Swiss-Prot record:
Domain of life: Bacteria
Family the entry assigns: Belongs to the SNF2/RAD54 helicase family. RapA subfamily.
Domain Helicase C-terminal span(s) in chain numbering: 491-643
Annotated gene: rapA
Record protein name field: RNA polymerase-associated protein RapA
The enzyme's E.C. designation: 3.6.4.-
Residues covered by the Helicase ATP-binding domain: 163-332
Alphabetic keyword roster: Activator, ATP-binding, DNA-binding, Helicase, Hydrolase, Nucleotide-binding, Transcription, Transcription regulation
Motif DEAH box location, chain numbering: 278-281
Stored SMART domains: DEXDc, HELICc
Residues noted as binding ATP in the record, renumbered to the chain: 176-183
Single biological process term from Gene Ontology: regulation of DNA-templated transcription
Organism of origin: Shewanella putrefaciens (strain CN-32 / ATCC BAA-453)
Length: 968
């Protein structure tokens, strides 16, 4: 290489050193000073990994004094380049020797890096292009936000999330029956709102006991890192901000915290975008005296644009309580309780018409008359004739029914603010079978009970009942060895025998107390060596994850998982179908919660519920009340808490006493009341609401598309290559999973979201659903999103040189492949990406400037290319510069034309969609007051803003690949 003092070079291996200056040339060595860092490097003149930096006419360069020069001409003297051109500040003709160039110059533009010899590996160019394509595909998906969460693809859940999550500031009531996944629906909506930019700040208000469960659910299922706020956290946060709620974007807190005026005032002032309230049916309200808790939520709902209320079903709440929730969502719409009752009565005709349309028989005259009146502004006669006709294609008739149903849904009822699914309307639940196993009461327990009664002492009726239901706890009060009870308790003997006879089955065991769960694990381990693990509230999240993973493991995993009451909250184990209730809770809702650990949508087997109980004790009497009175073991009992509230005192007396007649009377009265409530609920079912809530065929279509995306092997390959390029260690763990760890040779110093000790991931949804410790990787996962951002936000893969070995083309033939990005700067909340997302535009030019991209696709072209080393690549670029410069200008012409066309298409799509939606909502507002004026105003403003952003769309060169034909 010809070196001269003062020449400017850059290091091919350490480009971060900036622009270097040759300071010594002696013998076979050259010394280069890098002023930006003050470091010297000595190289062999023959093999120095250096690239000479020279600029061309038209380029703008900066002097070390800070002024710029637009180059018009280059001359050379004594081996140094002198640049002639116009001074940026004075406009005068000036010269600038290369020695005086600014040493902090970095080559960020792809063409600058190419001409400076900063040429990247061929595979990195490919990964960069794939990353841009993945980002574009994700941004254009109408299912954005639904693919990534680690949840089962349940139609009604995906439907609700799809419908609600796309709205601006949604205000809805989620009132599904227990076990249908209200928390998942809320999480999906939150995830979608955050991912699409419709929301940035979210406040979740939950009961104290559910804060931890929500924290875990949001992290494990939705990769959302919420922070739990209590009084201590608020005090700590004062160091960072006067308002502690401003220190985090995603916050979970309890109602108790917000009962304090100071904290409520701070929450009201914290600019939330979305408010989520769990267990909202506990907010007590009457027109005369709303509770403090209700007032807290009401105050927040008045200042937060989006509100999600998770609540029990309206059937369970009663009309007044249900009205109180709707009033929080839209006080202008639901302003008077009597008016609400009158409106509900008018829904009966709508429900009758909907039920007729949902069936397959011809419509009765009453239904036709109702439809004609309800849809008076439309001509529905052709649809009615089609439905009533004989010998017509059934698909056409079904389409006509669906169209009329949709018209009803749009115009009537509370379908836009209320979603309620019931097990009666949602398929996919297993059957439940109850298996009672009576055991003889041990003498030790009888003795403990007698001693306790002799000692006397005042206890409440509920405390006495709890004591009678857990004789092992009473026994431990009189024994030094607290674990000795399991040595003689016949329930433990039965449990051991049961597990031994069902060795191939996974068994979930639930007990009330953590101490009981720990004792049972010890009993199984020491007496028979049965593999079991425990799960209780004293364990950390990581410990619980490990226990759950050990239980889920098919080979070498635990046969049994023993949970405490609180420890099992929020965890589901659908892969098991045997449930052992070691004792019974004194609350029907807790019993349903226990069974709900297995009885979820997605459970593939019927559930066998086993109850080993002690005969002639409170355990047997409570079992009879649950089974004979409520049928709570084999069916869900939505009225369970109502019945418990009505019969609690009688039940407690029966449990504490031993009166057979009292028990018989209690069972008879409970059965009668149970049937009355069940009948009332059946009569009150709103068919139209159910149809709207579960989504029908439209929901199934969404799930089918999501399932197809899950099977996309091309995505898996792209993500694996992405991690390979970045340098993430990947270890195959088996069972469809791999372990990702940071490596010492990673391209970037940190990989946000990748823990130092690694993380186990899978691309298989079923595997992720069965293992809490394995993350589900989709293109929405933060590890993928971060990887895409690391590559596309850096210079990785922006330049490349390759050889095409093709004897059909003359040797030396040049092709220039240019990847441009069409983009428009806009806030995420504007939703511009729906119409003009960051879009890669590929241009493939031959030496004459013809664009061959339409004839030669990327994949087939890429397969034919071979890499060249950086040094040779730099020489090829230098030799080709006279050809390349005009090709860049030609490529930009083609790309700009493509961008102009994209903007036209985006504007047409935006105008068509938003104008259509606006017209639809404006016409519906005349007949359905649930259409909010805020939604209409948002659409009008959005159209104006989007047109402004589209006018400012930009074109940017993202990556370059120069290709030369070789016959060697």
């Amino acid at each position: 290489m010809p070196f001269a003092l003062g020449q400017r070079w850059i290091s091919d291996t350490e480009s971060e050193l900036g622009l270097g200056t040759v300071v010594q040339v002696e013998g076979r060595m050259v010394t280069v000073l890098f002023p930006a860092t003050g470091e010297n490097r000595m190289f062999s003149r023959a093999e120095a990994p250096l690239t000479r930096v020279t600029y061309n006419s038209g380029d703008t360069v900066e002097s070390h004094e800070g002024w710029s020069l637009t180059i018009e001409e280059l001359t050379e003297k004594d081996g140094l380049v002198i640049y002639h051109g116009i001074h940026s500040e004075t406009g005068e003709q000036v010269t600038l020797r290369e020695t005086l160039l600014n040493h902090n110059i970095r080559f960020n533009k792809p063409q600058d890096r190419l001409f400076a010899g900063q040429i990247d590996r061929l595979d990195r160019f490919g990964v960069r292009y794939q990353c841009q394509m993945l980002r574009h595909k994700l941004a254009t998906s109408d299912l954005l936000g639904l693919q990534g969460p680690r949840v089962g693809l349940i139609p009604h859940q995906m439907w609700i999330a799809h419908e609600v999550g796309r709205r601006y500031a949604p205000r809805v009531l989620l009132a599904d029956e227990v076990g249908l996944g209200k928390t998942i629906e809320a999480g999906l909506i939150i995830h979608q709102q955050l991912l699409t930019g419709r929301a940035e700040r979210v406040l979740v208000i939950v009961p104290d006991t559910l804060r931890h469960q929500w924290l875990v659910e949001m992290l494990r299922r939705f990769n959302l890192r919420f922070s739990v706020f209590d009084e201590d956290r608020c005090v700590e946060a004062y160091a960072d901000h006067d308002n502690p709620f401003y220190t985090e974007q995603l916050v979970i807190c309890s109602l108790e915290l917000l009962r304090k005026k100071k904290r409520l005032d701070q929450a009201l002032d914290a600019d939330w975008d979305l408010l989520v309230v769990d267990e909202a049916h506990h907010l007590e309200w009457t027109e005369e005296a709303p509770s403090r808790a209700y007032q807290v939520v009401e105050a927040l709902s008045e200042v937060v644009p989006g509100v999600l209320l998770l609540t029990a079903t309206p059937d369970q709440l009663g009309h007044e309580s249900h009205f109180a929730r709707l009033r929080l969502l839209d006080p202008d719409r639901f302003y008077d309780y009597d008016a609400f009752l009158a409106e509900e009565d008018s829904y009966k005709d709508v429900a009758m018409a909907a039920e007729a349309l949902a069936g397959n028989a011809k419509l009765p005259d009453a239904a036709i008359n109702s439809l004609t009146e309800l849809l008076s502004e439309k001509d529905i006669a052709p649809s009615i004739r089609l439905i009533q006709a004989d010998g017509i294609d059934s698909e056409l008739q079904q389409a006509a029914r669906s169209e009329l149903l949709q018209e009803l849904l749009d115009r009537h009822g509370t379908g836009r603010v209320l979603y309620r699914n019931s097990r009666a309307s949602v398929k996919g639940f297993p059957k439940r079978f109850f298996n009672p196993h009576p055991q003889t009461m041990p003498e030790q327990y009888l003795t403990a009970a007698r001693v306790s009664s002799m000692m006397g002492g005042h206890k409440t009726l509920e405390a006495k009942a709890a004591q009678a239901l857990s004789p092992e706890k009473l026994y431990q009060e009189f024994e030094d060895n607290s674990a000795s009870w399991w040595k003689f308790d016949p329930r433990v003997d039965w449990l051991i025998a049961f597990l031994k006879s069902h060795r191939s089955k996974k068994v979930l065991i639930i007990a009330s107390q953590a101490e009981t769960a720990l004792s049972l694990e010890e009993a199984l381990r020491t007496r028979e060596g049965i593999q079991a693990t425990v799960f209780h509230e004293g364990m950390s999240i990581i410990e619980r994850d490990k226990a759950g993973a050990y239980f889920a493991q098919e080979e070498g995993g635990a046969q049994a998982l023993i949970c405490s009451e609180i420890g099992s909250e929020g965890r589901n184990f659908q892969f098991a179908s045997h449930l052992v209730l070691f004792d019974l809770p004194l609350n029907p809702d807790l019993l349903e919660q226990r069974i709900g650990r297995l009885d979820r949508i997605g459970q593939k087997n019927d559930i066998q519920i086993h109850l080993p109980y002690l005969e002639d004790t409170a355990q047997e009497r409570l079992m009879q009340w649950y089974h004979q009175g409520l049928n709570a073991f084999e069916l869900t009992c939505p009225s369970g808490h109502v019945l418990y509230a009505e019969f609690a005192e009688d039940l407690l007396n029966v449990l504490v006493g031993d009166d057979a007649d009292e028990l018989t009377n209690l069972l008879n009265h409970t059965q009668t009341r149970y049937k009355e409530l069940k009948h009332a609920m059946e009569q009150g079912r709103d068919k139209l609401l159910e149809i709207n809530s579960h989504g029908g065929d439209r929901a199934k279509a969404i799930v089918e598309r999501l399932a197809q995306n899950d099977e996309n092997t091309q995505l898996i390959g792209s993500v694996i290559r992405l991690w390979d390029i970045i340098g993430v260690d990947q270890e195959d763990k088996g069972e469809n999973s791999i372990i990702l760890r940071p490596s010492e040779h990673m391209m970037f110093p940190t990989y946000p979201g990748l823990p130092e000790d690694g993380v186990t991931v899978t691309f298989d949804r079923d595997t992720a659903l069965s293992r809490d410790d394995i993350a589900l990787i989709t293109q929405e996962h933060p590890l993928v999103q971060t990887g895409l951002d690391l590559i596309t936000g850096s210079e990785t893969g922006t330049t490349s040189v390759a050889v095409l070995k093709n004897k059909a083309l003359p040797a030396g033939t040049l092709f220039l492949e240019l990847i441009y990005m069409a983009d428009a700067s806009a806030p995420k909340s504007s939703q511009l990406y729906r119409y003009l997302p960051p879009t890669p535009i590929r241009i493939l030019l031959d030496k004459n400037g013809n664009d061959l991209s339409a004839k030669v696709d990327y994949a087939s072209f890429d397969k034919q290319l071979s890499a060249v080393n950086r040094h040779i690549g730099g020489k090829l670029v230098t030799a080709s510069q006279p050809i390349l410069h005009p090709l860049f200008a030609k490529g930009e012409e083609y790309a700009q034309a493509a961008v102009d066309e994209l903007v036209i298409q985006a504007r047409e799509k935006m105008t068509t969609q938003l104008t259509g939606e606006l017209d639809r909502l404006e016409s519906l507002k005349a007949v359905n007051p649930n259409i909010r004026e805020e939604e209409l105003e948002y659409l009008r403003n959005q159209m104006q803003e989007l047109n402004t952003y589209l006018d400012a769309s930009q074109l940017q060169l993202d990556a370059i690949r120069m290709v030369l034909v070789s016959h060697v």
